[in-house]
Amino acid sequence: MDMVTLGSTGITVNKNGFGALPIQRISQEDAVYLARKAYKAGIRFFDTARAYTDSEVKLGEAFDGIRTEVYIATKTAAQNAEDFWKDLHTSLTNLRTDYIDLYQFHNPAFCPKPGDGSGLYEAMQEAKAKGMIRHIGITNHRLKVAHEAIDSCLYETLQFPFSYISGEQELELVNKCKAANMGFIAMKGLSGGLITNSAAAYAFEAQFDGVLPIWGVQRERELDEFLSYIDNPPRMTDDIRAVIEGDRAELCGEFCRGCGYCMPCPAGIEINNCARMSLLLRRSPSAEHLSPAGQAKMKKIEGCLHCNQCKAKCPYGLDTPALLARNYEDYKRVLAGEVKVQ
């Protein structure tokens, strides 16, 4: 079993974290079942957020009575101290607990610090002093903010996208966190569904002893894949290296990661899927994407207002309107039978 310690927090768990964003899409009963199954199999780290609708409520029911046996991380996207306290109290109620193991600022546009005028970090410190939270973390998609968080020495963990299609800049963050004794939580280990080989994804993450990947799970078969890696963790082999190199050749560069920070779109476009449709058509079953419902979603691209809000919000600096246009043209060719996909 591969284990990881999150820096100075002392939180030590097996190298399979449970990402609870997807369970907001399934029923309470199914979500509770999955979370409990994960716990019974040995997963101990569960990551959610105030922004993930009812995800916290579902975890709260799942761990009622066994709270001290799991580590729960959640997040606040509050922009001021008043909203911070509202979020924290709501999360504690939803999770049926009187403390949160790791409380994280959720993708802020800046790195909260004492004296910055927002009152956010001071609120974190007060919550920790009161025993309402045990450790302070930050999540982000921006390299600048991530580096600032590490350099500040104010945070015990950083959660950032990291997968085998990440580049040298993300790897630098991993190494920098290790040097600072700061835990690194890897989100988007499957790159929003574009990486389809979970064994390769796991083997890559397992190379970094200070990294805890959290896998987004909403189906039992997905959970079972990762549970199988607890006792039989995949290792880097020539075959897995070949898979990784093939995916890097296809996926590296300008493509949508599906993070959703561009949403909502004033024209109603489902940007986080439409802007990567060319990849989804080729890396997942295409029938659903080509259905009447899928066609209706893609057709909304024709109503793009070119307001550039999505471009301004993209943490990866993508020209999102242009990316949408390219994906729509490719989609129409696939739909017309001019281009073949599986």
Question: Could you say what each language-model-derived stretch is?
Answer:
Residues 1-70:
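N-terminal binding-site loop/beta-alpha segment at the start of enzyme catalytic domains
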Residues 3, 35, 56, 60, ...:
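Generic structural signal for well-ordered alpha-helices
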Residues 6, 18, 46, 59, ...:
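Conserved, mostly hydrophobic/aromatic
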Residues 29, 79-185, 190-193:
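Glycine/proline-rich, positively charged
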Residues 37, 41, 94-95, 152-153, ...:
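Structural motif
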Residues 43-44, 172-186, 190-342:
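Structured C-terminal cap/extension of enzyme domains
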Residues 44-49, 73-74, 134-137, 157-161, ...:
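Short catalytic-loop micro-motif centered on adjacent basic/acidic residues
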Residues 69-72, 155-163, 234-240:
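Short hydrophobic/aromatic-enriched beta-strand-loop microsegments
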